[in-house]
């Protein structure tokens, strides 16, 4: 197979990375995609760094066995814990990670706090701390750990009273005029954006790193002359460690959602 026609591998602790892959599909519809969701071991955000590193290397190995031409670690927690180690081990393949879209958030120039919703591990790791050092002096940045949110989404709960109550509890300390921008620092979270807008004002920007990551993926593929040149819609393959048809169905539903 021509190297350009080989698939792009995406990996996440569960279904969250599909929010990033959707952006990549919009940007490069003729590419072939393989998605590996590790729902059996979700959520990653409450595990130890060593556990997350082991799971990340396992996922990368399984994608390499599928002959992928690039890998997107579409998981903020795995990026925080393992991306540097993964890149140093696999030097011959583009490996793209994801970070909270803090740089983008600062460009909105709105009064109020920049609130970053993320898993506890993402907020503790050095990658996030270096982002805070870069932007923390000039902007009011608030970390909001949301440990349980991934579990809602992994169970297909994207709306409803229980989720709304959880989000209300998280935001109870902030009035709408206290909030400048909300940054979704976990790839699962874009799927509950509409429910979040029932809790905060609709004029508050909610942003994530999905598009920026997909643009970086395209740039890296172009740089390596790996962009697919075929003029037809590419294929999408979904694999989940959970092994259940239910997770595959949920994944398909999330890809097809607007």
UniProtKB/Swiss-Prot annotation:
Substrate binds at residues 12-13, 44-45, 76-77, 187-188. InterPro entries: Asp/Glu/hydantoin_racemase, Asp/Glu_race, Asp/Glu_racemase_AS_1, Asp/Glu_racemase_AS_2, Glu_race. It catalyses: L-glutamate = D-glutamate. One of its GO terms (molecular function) is glutamate racemase activity. It comes from the Bacteria. Its EC number is 5.1.1.3. Keywords: Cell shape, Cell wall biogenesis/degradation, Isomerase, Peptidoglycan synthesis. The active site is at 75 (proton donor/acceptor), 186 (proton donor/acceptor). The keyword Metal-binding does not apply. Pathway: Cell wall biogenesis; peptidoglycan biosynthesis. Gene3D superfamilies: 3.40.50.1860. GO terms for biological process: cell wall organization; peptidoglycan biosynthetic process; regulation of cell shape. Transmembrane segments: none annotated. SUPFAM superfamilies: Aspartate/glutamate racemase. Belongs to the aspartate/glutamate racemases family. Provides the (R)-glutamate required for cell wall biosynthesis. This is Glutamate racemase. It comes from Clostridium botulinum (strain Alaska E43 / Type E3).
